[in-house]
Amino acid sequence: HFTLLRAHLQSLPGEHDYGSLVAHDGLWQMAERTAHDVTARMALVPRTLEARGLDATPPIQAKLRQLGHPAALKAVDILDVIVRDEVGHVAIGNHWYGWLCQQQQLDPLAHYRELARRYRAPRLRPPFNWVAREQAGFVPAELQALQSEASG
């Protein structure tokens, strides 16, 4: 992903490269906060932050398509590759989070809520990419909980 995005940035007019634009480091901060707890890491990095990328990508792509500029349309294509790969990353996180909860005899839904609170995970807001989340292994109960929490 880095290589695709960096090459695209470098192809744009002006001097653009990795690091020349402002970006957040929320994923890295969460990785540091959960470094001592693999269950928390699986719950909050792939299942929360990377999954949020699944949600955010379609609206970003829609805005880029509206621009109609070749560079914007190239970015849409790059985001297609990234979101497809991210479904796999989130699926791996879902698998291992479920396995870890089973090994520790934890209820995955209840434990997720506790971990999100304890580690100050960002509150997830719509829109949600339900199809990508299902492809990534989120079960109906998790999707219903996500919808309920976002609504209330």
Task: Map each language-model feature to its residues.
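Non-heme di-metal
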Residues: 1-152
